[in-house]
Each structure stands twice: as structure tokens, then as C-alpha cells.
């Protein structure tokens, strides 16, 4: 029985649900993990996560499909990406098979909170891990919690698929040879000042360039970037400091193998933007959000697709991927995992 929620007007914000999942690493091993209705966490004031930001997270969604099934999208890739984050941050890896099963179990325990098909809302799934024991010198924790919370959410950007305006930031999202390619909490803490400043200046997001030369486009604070050139080629920036987006990876497959598009992953100089016809953000939260204008200090780059409608290529990509997720378009084997 679905909850009495105004699904069509949900904000992108946290709502407490029935159950979360929690597992604990102690004495060199994970316990079995369990579902819990306690959504609070009690830790030492000197916990490693509070003192030294030893934490990473993931993001994925559960959906109701056109035929009434509840599914999630490629959770195995979230497990693999979290493994990379954990290794980089000196944290224990939560096994891939247990990660996927925990996702299934926590969604199953919160089926009342999965929005109905066609509502535009989804159940956001947030796996995360943190160092939980007290640490006063700079060193890794020895005890950890792996948790998964879920919450129903509306669109990430209020306008849905209406184009947004972004700016090229003077600040860096990540350091060269740093942690830009993992989903570490510290990366997002670094972007908070920038995103608040961007919003205060009338922009939806910051577009970051490479930290070494500030010449090549990388990504925004919370999503990867896509471009379309005049020949209809899908372009995406290539860099070692970009988070490997599962949505971007999926869109590249959709473009190349389903829509028959040419795809290039390469370094993209910011001076090339004026020659592109479409631009968009992609990620779990936004799927694809079109960009209509990029401001680079005094210069404004306005894409031919405009500020009113999503461009035709981005629209087709978005419709195809969301169609696969919602069960109206046949996708590659194993992409959609049914919750049953």
C-alpha cells in the first residue's frame, strides 16, 4: 500500500522511511548486517569521520515500471565504484554481492515509499560508509559502519527538463592526482561554498575546468557533462579527476549501441563550447538536465537548443535511458534489477 504522499510535488529532499540497512566492521570483519528502524547514529565526538572526513557514498534509484514492477538500475556498478572509493580512503570493502542484496532488501522493506509509475518521482537510495571509532591522530579508523538509507524524491532541478544556466568556476573541484575520481564526502564539502555562491549569482551549477591548467572542461559539482557537436557526435570530457558516472557510462552505451550515434570521450577545451549545439548534465539525481547557457566571466555561450526546451539529441538520450529504467524500452541484459 503506497503512502499518502503528493508524489507529483515531491522536493529533492530527505524524508524518513520505514527501514535502513546497517552493517558494522569490527575486529577485521563485517557482521551480517540488518535492517533497522532507527535512523539515528550514535558515535564518539572524536570519530574519524568527524575529525578527518573518512567517508564515501553512492547514489542510485528504485522505480516503478510501466507494468507495476519495482526495479533498480545497475546496482552492481555502484558496488564497484564504492569499492574504488573505499580502497582509496583506507576503508574496508563491502562485498559486491552483499551490497546488491542489501540494496534489494532495503527497497523491499520500503515498498510503500516507492513512487508510482508516471509520477516523475523515484526512491533515492544512498549507500554510505564512514570511520566510526575515535581517532585523534591522522590515521584511518579501525571500525566502520556501512549503511543504506532510502527516501522518495522529486526532480533534482525544480524545472525538470527545462534548460539551466551554469557558470565556469575559477575554483577547483578536485586536486591533480587527488580524489576527484572517487565519491568521497570531502569532494562535496569542497564544493559547498562554490554552489551556494553560484546560486546567489543566479546559476544552477558550477562547471569546473581541470585544476592543472584551468583550460579543459571536467564536470560540475554533482554531475558529469555531455556535449553534442554540429555533426551530431556525443562528446564527453576525458580526465583522471572526473568521477566515473554510471549514468554517463550508460548513456554512452545507449548513444552508440541503441541510437547508432558517434561518441567521443576526449579532452574538451573550454574554447570549443561555442561550436557545440547542445549541452547537458548527467547523473543519478538529474538523469539528463539540459544546459542552455554557460557563462565564462564576461562571455556568455548560448546553445542553439535555447533556454526553453531540451535539445533533440539530449531529449532522445534521456527518453531512451529513462525508458529502459521504466520498462518501456528494451535495454541491455542485466541493467535493470527487479526487487522481488
Where are these regions (language model features)?
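Extended, Lys/Arg-enriched charged tracts that mediate electrostatic binding to polyanionic substrates
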Residues: 116-130
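Charged, gly/pro-rich active-site loop segments
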Residues: 106-120
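Helix-start/capping segments and mature chain N-termini
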Residues: 1-106, 128, 135-340
